[in-house]
From Swiss-Prot:
It comes from Microcystis aeruginosa (strain NIES-843 / IAM M-2473). Catalyzes the last two sequential reactions in the de novo biosynthetic pathway for UDP-N-acetylglucosamine (UDP-GlcNAc). The C-terminal domain catalyzes the transfer of acetyl group from acetyl coenzyme A to glucosamine-1-phosphate (GlcN-1-P) to produce N-acetylglucosamine-1-phosphate (GlcNAc-1-P), which is converted into UDP-GlcNAc by the transfer of uridine 5-monophosphate (from uridine 5-triphosphate), a reaction catalyzed by the N-terminal domain. The keyword Transferase applies. Its main location: cytoplasm. The gene is glmU. It comes from the Bacteria. It catalyses: alpha-D-glucosamine 1-phosphate + acetyl-CoA = N-acetyl-alpha-D-glucosamine 1-phosphate + CoA + H(+); N-acetyl-alpha-D-glucosamine 1-phosphate + UTP + H(+) = UDP-N-acetyl-alpha-D-glucosamine + diphosphate. Pathway: Nucleotide-sugar biosynthesis; UDP-N-acetyl-alpha-D-glucosamine biosynthesis; N-acetyl-alpha-D-glucosamine 1-phosphate from alpha-D-glucosamine 6-phosphate (route II): step 2/2; Nucleotide-sugar biosynthesis; UDP-N-acetyl-alpha-D-glucosamine biosynthesis; UDP-N-acetyl-alpha-D-glucosamine from N-acetyl-alpha-D-glucosamine 1-phosphate: step 1/1; Bacterial outer membrane biogenesis; LPS lipid A biosynthesis. Acetyl-CoA binds at residues 376, 382-383, 419, 436. Its cofactor is Mg(2+). This is Bifunctional protein GlmU. Its EC number is 2.7.7.23, 2.3.1.157.
Amino acid sequence: MVAVAILAAGKGTRMKSSLPKVLHPLGSRSLVERVLNVSESLHPQRKLVIIGYQGQQVRNTLQHLDDIEFVEQKEQLGTGHAIQQLIPHLEDFQGDLLVLNGDVPLLRPETLQNLLQIHQDHGNAATLLTANLPNPKGYGRVFCDGNNLVKQIVEERDCTDAQRQNHRINGGIYCFNWSKLAAILPNLTPNNDQGEYYLTDVVNFLDPVMAVDVEDFLEITGINDRKQLAAAYDILQTRVKDDWMAAGVTIIDPDSVTIEDTVTLSADVIIEPQTHLRGETIIASGCRIGPGSLIENSRIGSDVTVLFSVISDSQVDSGCRIGPYAHLRGEAKIGANCRVGNFVEIKKSSIGNKTNIAHLSYLGDATLGEKVNVGAGTITANYDGVKKHQTMIGSGTKTGANSVLVAPLKLGKNVTVAAGSTITKNVPDNALVIARESQRVIENWADQFQ
């Protein structure tokens, strides 16, 4: 059996924020959610989050996740003290405990799987993740024998000049035999200048303790301030974009593009510069997205072109051309082979196949049939100051330029709306509707002002 404990009690004063450090977002997820997510690769039987500073806020953020147990650390007296709080919660647990930090979000599943496998294969009392850094300044050093068995962990401030030449550092990720750890946890003492209980001190009481080097030391990058948060985002983005390019996606100018790791892309998608893909977005093969576009929590069908546009919480079917400067939001559904042109906004509306909305229109709370042509400047006046109302437009209908459709309203099939009309009443199939003042010409009008 495997239990996972995540240290999430700290305040994170260097973040200069009222938000607990572990709740700061890295892309689409908070730091601690990323740690929980990667730990799922081990299929743990128990998942414990140790909380302290603004613990209720951490609880509220994670309440949508299944089977999370919260352990309160009322005083933050170090990592060893945090793990001591687990004793009553794991009283009957028999198995291994993986200890992770809630502010180390870049670990890969393979790294944790390898750590656990080595720990179990060797029957270790403890196994810790280490790294060889080119510049280990600021980190405690790990000293091992030729079999990678840990003999000593020394904090940098306590290192001699000779010890500082060792570049192997402690990554702060541990796997313990819980029964052996629980037996010695009460023996920890705050024997240091900070008055804290260090988890690293258990090395003096457990045997054997083995070190496992991580292949990419960037995986154990911790987040302590906003600069490190930004650096972690860059690392995450590089991973995501490299993976998609290896899978057949073209990304033009990757440095100007962001793709969250919750996005799903197909082969032969082309991502133009200054494009940002977020949330649970899915983009099918043959699409060309950008430049200058933002798509969030949306599903894009095959062979769609999106130029300089914003799409959120919406669906675009295959063969459409969106933009430039279009805005689709609030569950907009665009049928196949539609054109949504410049300065068009569509909100909570369903658009039938082969419909054209070429420019300068607003459609809200509307349902359009197939092969509708929406003239320039057409808007649905869907809000009466209290409620939103529906507009229905039948297939084959054409609206003239500068038309206003005042909801609730139903236009039949093959209706023609004359330019400049304000329509307030339902219109039957195959009708021409004109609702505007008759033109008057007053000759010689200017003469009176001369």
